[in-house]
């Protein structure tokens, strides 16, 4: 609802809303932003049995202030989580390596599909616990088209413009990744 005190399921076909956003850089201090709520069929492409339906936080994001322990004490997990979680980084933390920040991004935004059995149709795996060679990301050819890029790779070392991953994330419309919610 408009007061944001209750949520309702979007119509089966999805719907579009226009919001007025405060923005000091826009004429008059506001701008309009259109948001499309996905259809249920679109939602089910990611929220499915392979992903355990819920796509929210990743356990490594909760390794702070005893959050995992609190949730386990409240019986929020069907089975205990492993004590050791993969290391993730704040993307803005310049003291973390670019490698760790990039792998963190892929873990949190891509690995729910781009993993064995996860539904992603590409052969690469984005899980942070794999060593980089095992992910088949760097200097591996794409399996879902090259977007017209000569000698494209999923990630082309030292040449982001020949990297399908970069181009799909930067793209609007068909071929964009992720397909929805961005």
Model segments located where?
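Extended surface/linker regions that mediate inter-domain or inter-protein docking
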Residues: 1-104
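Periplasmic/extracellular electron-transfer cofactor-ligation site
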Residues: 40-55, 108-132
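Electron-transfer interface patches adjacent to heme c in soluble/periplasmic c-type cytochromes
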Residues: 66-102, 112-117, 125-182
């Amino acid at each position: 609802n408009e007061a944001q005190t209750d949520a309702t399921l979007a119509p089966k076909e999805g719907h579009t809303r226009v919001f007025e956003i405060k923005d000091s850089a826009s004429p008059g201090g506001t701008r309009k932003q259109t948001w499309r709520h996905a259809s249920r069929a679109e939602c089910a492409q990611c929220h499915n049995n392979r992903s355990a339906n819920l796509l929210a936080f990743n356990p490594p994001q909760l390794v702070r202030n005893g959050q995992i322990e609190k949730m386990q004490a409240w019986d929020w997990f069907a089975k205990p989580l492993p004590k050791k979680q993969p290391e993730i980084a704040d993307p803005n933390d310049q003291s973390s390596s670019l490698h760790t920040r990039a792998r963190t991004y892929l873990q949190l935004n891509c690995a729910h599909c781009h993993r064995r059995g996860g539904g992603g149709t590409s052969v690469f795996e984005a899980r942070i616990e794999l060593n980089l060679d095992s992910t088949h990301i760097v200097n591996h050819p794409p399996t879902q088209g090259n977007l017209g890029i000569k000698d494209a790779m999923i990630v082309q070392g030292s040449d982001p413009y020949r990297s399908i991953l970069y181009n799909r994330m930067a793209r609007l419309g068909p071929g964009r990744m992720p397909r929805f919610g961005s």
